[in-house]
C-alpha cells in the first residue's frame, strides 16, 4: 500500500457511519469524528494541498459550513484567499445570490460581489458531494463574477447520486478523496 493509500484509509477509518440518520435507510457519513482526530484532519489537508500546490489557484471558495473547515486551511497553506459562500442574509456587504432546488424546496447561497475577480482561478472545496445542487449554485456565483472554476474538491463523494455528472454538465471536473456508496 502506498503512503497516499495508507493516508486515505486512515482518513476513511476516522469517519463514523451513523445508520438511519437523519431518516431510516440513510447511512450518514459523520466528518466530525475526522475533525476530532488531529492526525486525520491534518492528513486530509495535506492531501488537498499536495494536489493543488503549483496549479495556479488564486482563490478557494468554501460552502457553508463544513466547506469552511477544509477550504480555509488549504487556502492558508497555498497562500491564497479564502471566500465563504453562505446562506442568504449572512454576509454583511453587497452580495450575489443563487437559488437552487432541494429535495423538498429551495435554498439560496450568497457571496460578496467583490470576492472573485475576472480571471481568478478558483478551487471550490466542500465536505461532501451528493446530488451536486449546492456546488452547482456555487459555480454559477463564481462564473457570474468572472472567475474560472478550476475544479471542485470534496472529502467524501456519495456514489450514485449524480453529483459528478451534474458538475460535468457544467464543464467542471471534480475530485473526491473518498468515495462511499449512497446508502
From Swiss-Prot:
Pathway in which this enzyme or protein is active: Purine metabolism; AMP biosynthesis via salvage pathway; AMP from adenine: step 1/1
Record's catalysed reaction(s): AMP + diphosphate = 5-phospho-alpha-D-ribose 1-diphosphate + adenine
Keyword Transferase found: yes
Domain of life where this protein originates: Bacteria
Protein EC: 2.4.2.7
Alphabetical list of InterPro entries matching this protein: Ade_phspho_trans, PRibTrfase_dom, PRTase-like, UPRTase/APRTase
Keyword Transferase: yes
GO cellular component: cytoplasm
Entry keywords, A to Z: Cytoplasm, Glycosyltransferase, Purine salvage, Transferase
GO biological process, alphabetically ordered: adenine salvage; AMP salvage; purine ribonucleoside salvage
Localization in the cell: Cytoplasm
Principal cellular location given in the protein's record: cytoplasm
A molecular-function term among this protein's GO annotations: AMP binding
Signal sequence interval, chain numbering: none
One Pfam family from the record: Pribosyltran
Family statement: Belongs to the purine/pyrimidine phosphoribosyltransferase family.
Function summary: Catalyzes a salvage reaction resulting in the formation of AMP, that is energically less costly than de novo synthesis.
Quaternary structure note: Homodimer.
Name of the protein in its database record: Adenine phosphoribosyltransferase
